[in-house]
Amino acid sequence: MRCNCPYVVCKYHGNCAACIAHNRESGDMAHCMEKVAMERGAKMPLRMPEKVYLENDYEAMSRRSAELVCDVVRKKPDALVSLPAGSTAKRTFEIMCEMAKAGEVDFSKTRFVALDEWLDLEDESENCNGFMCKHFYGPAGIPDEHITRFDIHAKDLDAACKAVDEVVFANGGIDVMLLGVGMNGHLGLNEPNSDFTLYSKVVDLDSVTMSVGQKYFTDGMKLTRGITLGIHHMFETGLVILRVGGVHKAEIMEKVFRSAPTEDIPATVLKLVPHGVIVTDRDAAANVLDLLENI
């Protein structure tokens, strides 16, 4: 049975009695209880992600991210992996390909599932799939049959979402998911105010995403909608890695760290997922170094 909790996905999948019993024993508080308490004025201790890797620069951050993904593949060669399209991930992909060529990791049995994709583009040559084929799938020699993509031309896009979900469910969840964070805190194309309980879905893009997304297209592009793995999948992923780099991400990084988990800032879900880590460089973490000292 899938969780129907109106607050957030949890490992008890709607078995509230078991959740309450666990929290009595541990002295902890479930997120749903925490949310109600905060709405009534209680001051709760600040939640932190499970693990944060603070790296000196972009190169070190990229290498750490690559190592974390490849470590999962070494332990499970046929792992199901989800990777993000985007310029900040290029060096991570280069390192992963270098490691494969050096025999340090083998992707021949690894399977991949698309994180997200733009919809309604006039020219799809520079979409997410095009980026991934150019910068990772092609160089790494990943066969097409090992890649699950959203059918962006389907007449029934909800059915296309369910088809991808079924691939993930059949695997027992994604084994490792690498993410970047948007300037508005989005993960994949899970925009602000995304429902944490949803799996794959079609989304209307936030104005920030419409604007910032222009950088991925040579001649600009009208962006209106997207399709994405939902945040619920992240709760059922073996390892979720959020990489955040550059001084331009310092503001959203501070919001993520200094906010309670909230659907207003999707990236705060990293404070809730069972196996979530953040990999960041000092530029992005400049405003939260005081918090990182205690993790």
Predicted regions and their residues:
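Glycine-rich N-terminal segment of FAD-binding domains in flavoprotein oxidoreductases
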Residues: 75-101
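ATP/nucleoside-binding phosphotransfer catalytic cores, i.e., glycine-rich phosphate-binding loops
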Residues: 237-295
